[in-house]
Amino acid sequence: MKQFKRGIERDGTGFVVLMAEEAEDMWHIYNLIRIGDIIKASTIRKVVSETSTGTTSSQRVHTMLTVSVESIDFDPGAQELHLKGRNIEENDIVKLGAYHTIDLEPNRKFTLQKTEWDSIDLERLNLALDPAQAADVAAVVLHEGLANVCLITPAMTLTRAKIDMTIPRKRKGFTSQHEKGLEKFYEAVSTAFMRHVNLQVVKCVIVASRGFVKDAFMQHLIAHADANGKKFTTEQRAKFMLTHSSSGFKHALKEVLETPQVALRLADTKAQGEVKALNQFLELMSTEPDRAFYGFNHVNRANQELAIETLLVADSLFRAQDIETRRKYVRLVESVREQNGKVHIFSSMHVSGEQLAQLTGCAAILRFPMPDLDDEPMDEN
């Protein structure tokens, strides 16, 4: 996601000027826009004109419109958002108050204005602007002269740097040029890695190559970090996993991720973390039901007693058309975090999110049993 301008006041009102660059960005935008928000974007309007003789002709005209959103339709396959609303600014082509549908797609600039940017909105916005925050896996696939430095988010793989250099061939009696070329290559890859990979965030770093290239690179990376005052801690070194890949091309990463030993190592990453939390909740419902509750009233009551260890929330609840419904879930998330509880926001595009939605979309694992909660109504009705 690209941000051109941000004007959000302390009271939460304000606007941002954005442009989606990746398919995943459209999903973030869908989760940001709500009914009542104001969208300003370039669009196409069919204009019908009539001549003095009574004949009519129509043409499609580009214009800039500002609409107050009344309906939102997202097509995940086409990665398009269709936003229908009334025009709220004077325009030579479209009358004030006339309906129009603005179509948003990747690489189309737009302005989003809200009367309230809450903490979930800002979290989602910052996540979209810096995908590295969501990437808990980094990978370097390489062979001599070619390397791809990638970040893997729950939704996609992002190439952060591609290093392509010509390495002089190794010749008998003339190995120095080859070794200098390799040294220069490893230095370039190390620099790119340190720039794009945040070892405070990622849980695992895969370094993959044929032969011993990965080992030589790893030695150089450690030395590079030491020389630049960023020496790896024991904990950070433990995050690295060296494995085989067929090449340094990006497509080789797919093969690497599918190998059993890598899949096992990645079992505790964010995407897997949500599945793990849901499975733990479902297991507790069978073994310790007084520590596993779902439905807003039960979960909110547990939160009032500072009992929530892990909160599970479906992102669809933050897309509620009723502002007060959204606000109560935002307040719940903020409160649980303030009490040092864990919060997992599940995507409705994933199977685990669909499963949570069947349990009202809101569930909690408690720090201690609360048997009396069963006596209270699950919902407000």
UniProtKB/Swiss-Prot annotation:
Biological processes annotated in GO: cell division; meiotic cell cycle; nonfunctional rRNA decay; nuclear-transcribed mRNA catabolic process, no-go decay; nuclear-transcribed mRNA catabolic process, non-stop decay; ribosome disassembly; RNA surveillance
Q: What is the annotated localization of this protein?
A: Cytoplasm; Nucleus
Concerning Pfam families, the annotation shows: eRF1_1, eRF1_2, eRF1_3
Q: Is Cell membrane found in the keyword set?
A: no
What InterPro entries is this protein classified in?
eFR1_2_sf (IPR042226), eRF1_1_Pelota (IPR005140), eRF1_2 (IPR005141), eRF1_3 (IPR005142), Pelota/DOM34_N (IPR038069), Ribosomal_eL30-like_sf (IPR029064), Transl-rel_pelota (IPR004405)
Could you say which cofactors this protein requires? a divalent metal cation
Name one cellular component (GO) term: cytoplasm
Function, as annotated, reads: Component of the Pelota-HBS1L complex, a complex that recognizes stalled ribosomes and triggers the No-Go Decay (NGD) pathway. In the Pelota-HBS1L complex, pelo-1 recognizes ribosomes stalled at the 3' end of an mRNA and engages stalled ribosomes by destabilizing mRNA in the mRNA channel. Following ribosome-binding, the Pelota-HBS1L complex promotes the disassembly of stalled ribosomes, followed by degradation of damaged mRNAs as part of the NGD pathway.
Q: How does it assemble?
A: Component of the Pelota-HBS1L complex, also named Dom34-Hbs1 complex, composed of pelo-1 and hbs-1.
- Which family does the entry's similarity section mention? Belongs to the eukaryotic release factor 1 family. Pelota subfamily.
The identity of this protein, by name, is Protein pelota homolog
